[in-house]
Amino acid sequence: MITAHPAITIRRAVADDEPAIHAMVRRERLNPHHLYFRNFAVAVSGHEIVGASQIRHHRDGSRELGSVVVTPLWRGCGISARLIEFLLAGEGSVVHVITRKRHAHHYERWGFAPIPARLAPCPIRLNFRIGDTIGTIMALVQRRRVNRLMILRRTV
């Protein structure tokens, strides 16, 4: 972890950022679909992308905060919070997030609250079901604790 905090810039992603975003998302084994740079904000230190997050724009109009990722060296410095605040500042509609149950409390400060999956829009419900099923199967195969997912909603 970085203890001295050099300047971190949060900005909208540009096309040249896409390879770094894809690499970070793959490294963390996050949902690899719908990774369009136009939906992303990035955290930059010097010329290095050290964090990224996006709001997915689904065809039905629903919005999903996702792909929140920070490089290991920079974790614990508040970068993910700054990325989320940056993205949510530009959103005037309902936003959902799919997260592990044990991480849900981190989203309360932005007004996210748990909802039953049946109340989520179809694309978000589908992402939730796929992620929860794959995560459960992988945990069982690897003989580790199952970390269940949940859906949170933020209303404006």
Place the predicted regions along the sequence by residue.
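C-terminal "cap" of GNAT-fold acetyltransferases
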Residues: 121-156
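Conserved beta-strand in the GNAT
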Residues: 42, 48-57, 62-69
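Short amphipathic alpha-helix that is part of the acyltransferase structural core
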Residues: 1-32, 42-44, 146-156
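Short, small/polar residue-rich loop motifs at catalytic or cofactor-binding pockets
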Residues: 36-37
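Conserved GNAT acetyl-CoA-binding A-motif
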Residues: 89-102
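Conserved active-site alpha-helix within GNAT-family acetyltransferase domains
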Residues: 101-128
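Conserved acetyl-CoA-binding loop-helix of GNAT-fold acetyltransferases
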Residues: 70, 76-89
